[in-house]
Amino acid sequence: SKYSIHSYDDSVRPKAEGVYNSPYQIKDYDLGDLTDLLLKSNDVLKGNSKIVTATSMARIVDMNMKYVCSNGSNLEQNFLYVGPGFRAIAQDGNIIQSRSYTDQCQQTGMEVFNEEFIIKKCESICKEAVELLSAEECPTEKMDLVLHSDQMLLQIHESIGHALEVDRILGDERNYAGSSFVNLEDFGNLKYGSDLMNITFDPTIKEEFASYGFDDTGNKASKEFIIKEGVLQRGLGGLESQER
C-alpha cells in the first residue's frame, strides 16, 4: 500500500504451533463459599471502630485464546488470572489513612483463597490502617533510600517498562499513552544504570501476570536482555514494531 508506514516482511510473522496453560492447582470453586469468605474478611477488616470503609474483592479471569494464521500458525493459550483484594480506610477527625493488599498480578488458581492466610492478612490491614493515623510524618530531607521489593517492582515498571515500549518510542501511542525519553539511536548505546544493572524480559517464568507461550503475533516466548551491564539493549514490543 502507498500509505503504509513500513513494508511488510514475512520474518515478523514466524510460523508457530503449540499450547500454553496457566499453572494452577484448583480451578473450580463454589460462588457461595467464595462470597462467604469475602464477607468474613470484610468483618475482620472492620475490626476497629476507626475503620470507616472496608472492601473485599475477588478477581477471576478465565480466558481462552485461539490463534490461526495463513502462515501455518496454529496455537492455543489458556490463561487463568486469580487474585483477592482487600482495603481498609481509617479516620480520626480530619486524618484519613488507608491500608490495602492486592494479589491480582499473577496466573494461578483458586488455591490463593486460603482462609487462614486471608484472615491474618485482613487483621494486619486493619491494625496498620489505624496505626497510620498516629504515625509521624516522613521527614523532608535528602537521605539514602532502601526500596522494598514491592516498591522496586513499581519503580522498574514505570521507569523502565513504560519507557521502553517500542510503540511509544515510535510515536504510535503519543496521543493515547504518551511518548518516551528513549530514542531509537539509544539502543546499544544509552547508559541506563550502573554496570551492575541487568534486566531481562522473560515471559517463560511461570505464574507471572505477563507469562505466556506466544505473543499476539505468534512469536514464541523467550528470555531477552533489555538492559545488560547498565546499557540499553532493546525495547518491549512485537516483532513488527521491533523491525521498524
Residue ranges and their predicted role:
Residues 1-214, 219-222, 228-231:
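Active-site bordering "gate/hinge" segments
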Residues 229-244:
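C-terminal, non-catalytic macromolecule-binding modules
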